[in-house]
Amino acid sequence: HDDELGHQLDAIPDQLAFLLGQEAWESLAERFGGRRRYWFVGGGPNVATAYEAALKLSEAAWASAIGLECEQFLHGPWAALEPDDVVFVIAPPGPSHARCHDVARVAAGIGATVVALVAEADREIGSLAAETIALPEVPELLSPITAAVPLQLLIYHFAVRAGANPDTVREQTPHGRARASVTP
């Protein structure tokens, strides 16, 4: 069992290289940039992926972003969703896939743009999405690795499109100075 997991881990760099070469990241940033709010929703181990992506988008591109677990989103925050928002549904195969599908159904039903990070063969969530990013097939436990990297690259392009330096986190603006005043 450990050998199988080790082999799957060893394959991830090549899978990511292939994935990163498949998408037109600048074009995606152009299509989905400048929106009111961005939602990143995942289940299982990809709750952390959703939180991290929202944090990075806020830091790098100065955009309003929120990361949520599927059940959190479906409990109440969905009511704040608007048609101009973008919802990234991080839904590789695994136990959380069904609830991620529910998230995509709600978001699409409201008229928000859905971007699905799913297995290439996924037709359930993929059919609801304006764009799909096909993730390599790995166990759900390893999927945060394969989902976080393309999101980071897309967020970089969101930042560049917005004219923000993704490495400075507004250090030279009143925002950065205000935060620095409370950080030792």
Predicted features along the sequence, with ranges:
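A SIS-like phosphosugar-recognition module
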Residues: 1-184
